[in-house]
Amino acid sequence: MAVSQQPDSIEVRGARVHNLKDIDIDIPLGKLVGIAGVSGSGKSSLALGVLYAEGSRRYLEALSTYTRRRLTQAEHAQVDEVLHVPAALALHQRPSVPGVRSTFGTMTELNNSLRLLFSRCAHHVCPHCGARVEPSLNVAAGLSLTCPTCGREFYAPSAEDLAFNSGGACPTCGGTGVMREVDEASLVPDESKTINEGAVLPWGTLMWDLMKQVAGEMGVRTDVPFNQLTPQERDIVFHGPAVKKHILYVPKNGEGATPLDFTYYNAVYTVENALAKVKDDKGLKRVARFLREGPCRDCGGTRLSEAARQPQVRGINLAQAAAMTLGDAIEWVRGVPASLPPEMQPMATDICDSFLGAARRLVDLGLDYLSLDRAGATLSTGERQRVQLARVVRNRSTGVLYVLDEPSIGLHPANVDGLVGVMRDLVGDGNTVVVVDHDTRVLAEADYLVEMGPVAGAGGGSVIAAGTVDEVEQSQGSRIAPFLRAEPKRLRPQVTDDEMFDQGHIRMATDTIHTVKPLEVDIPRGRLVAVTGVSGSGKTTLVLETLIPALKAQAAGERLPRHVRWVDAEGIARANLIDATPIGANVRSTVATYADIHDELRRAFARTQEAKAAGYKAGAFSYNTGALRCPTCDGTGSISLDVQFLPDVEIVCPACHGSRYADAASHIHREGKDGSLLTLPQLMDMSVDEAIDATVGLKKVQTRLHTLHDLGLGYLTLGEPTPALSGGEAQRLKLASEMGRVQDDAVFVFDEPTIGLHPLDVQVLLSVFDGLVAKGATVIVIEHDLDLIRNADYVIDMGPGGGDAGGQIVCAGTPDDIAACPASITGRYL
């Protein structure tokens, strides 16, 4: 009998997703395959739009007739044929932000091992007399324990009883570790006002205005500045008793006074009462300005009940173990088996090995500085993505296609080796890994490279090089080849140490916050400044949680944040954070609407003879509310299918094919540059660069389109939904309104702006920064990308390590100074 040969590659034929040009490509199975290319060249279209889409669709179609019937409405990828594609999983660039009950320990499932350890192997406390009982195998066997002091029997808590999301939750905070309290300083922000002038804010926003009159009846003077009230009067305002008072109510129109009996609500109770009635996020927002969040006073922020904090292993309880960083917890767990009686050691070793096995990959990915009780929502995008990756590796599945979308985001060069090791583990287990990335160190480790291009948008979508790394390096048409083989070079003139502070200083001194120690920082004005350091070294805390709030407070004449001792930044009026969060909450926000182009286009089309004849004004051309929007999808371009037992499936609207407009919109034309007639749906389907030629004569539109082109966004289509943009694209789009203005009073802060950028795109980004600096702006970037760091004027390197081992300025100076600094981990890679 002939043995059929195992396929050795995924065969893609005729792929036309997005801008792909009918491409044919073979992707080796069981290998680490890198996909490179400039932003918008079609990398994600191939990896996610073809390989993942087909792999996941075929897997889902095998589930059941009902599911298959519903899902076949979801379009197949636009491809002639994909052969031998395994079931596929995608690890996306931006994993969702977890909820309030999620911690680093629960996300990584390390808490499961810890809870099991504290249930099975702890010294438990007798609930009758409070004596400690030696560890015993009875717990694992489901038997009771006998107290050596009082002789009574009891059952030890199970692992479930130690979970803060279950039986072990603190009853006061419900296992969240957080309590909301009224912040009295926020109740009267301006004490120079009188109560009649609205000094007590909650009475004006959360309560009837009548409370001012009631306060007067309580003996408080309401016509003198608040800062002149006696201590007794202030106490009545903040904490006075709820007593009824008789007042005379005069309506605003002054007609007819009405006597009323009214109960006095002091300022603090007004907020507490409003908080108790909150039903949704909108309501919470109204109250939140008067609240401060602090650790729960009963559990101290540990989330655990008193009973769940009783069992001890190696002299500490579960809350203390969870407060350790992962690195410290590993050392502690290693010592657990030896601390127990001999008969307990085999079981303890098994539990500890499961913890250490899961922890090893997290350490390889550079996450050893995170504490297990760190709230999941406070992790950065890169940290969440690496947690997701480590979890996948631990599952040890085989025969799966893993598509990783830029896993090197937020990764310090020192952790790239760990990332490659994790991907190699997946391949070693018999899987295929396709990684879309720009980091040349990641791409250089691939078994096979596919490069898309040559440029972005309509000019891309072709395979310009494919083969081993050596073959791609020798390829004439490759655009990544020079970066795979070349030595790095500086693209901007270096500012000398003597000139660095010629345009002034921004100075700040801080106290301890998180892992950042008290420090003083000096930043040169009008320069490109990079803040660097390994993950967890304190970059984000220093810049986003300290510098920006301090600059904003000083500019507004408000009180500095508690942990900032002083700041000296005379002349700085604006501190702008340009981060990578998606623009717009839903698909109704597009590049054209965000960049203020769509309104101008609507007006232009409303001026045409065809529009006038049909009676269409500018409002009719709105795809959100206008008469010409598609009635099937309501102008969103897509519809959602409800699939029972599965998440809803989004498909392109079958009526408008994603254009968002009804057929009638295609009957209104405007003349383009070459005399061709264009409709608004056709324009919205064009890239920025194509639209420049098509909108000659529309001055405002031209200006805005040229700005987008200069920002390196010429390949984006005007109708592209902004939430779908990559982090780097979103950052640059947010800059569109800032370009060209004088900026010497502004500080721009970018959080990892090179996310999603090819080395060639990084050069475009540097020219954007140059444009801002030339206008006098101070540009501060939190960054791991070595090309950008090399081209900065000034570098502040945090560290030396992450977590407790970081939080200091290791060195500051030019990139050459950092490279020469022996204590700097970043410097070694420069």
Task: Report residues per predicted region.
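Conserved phosphate-binding elements of NTP-dependent enzyme cores
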Residues: M1-L830
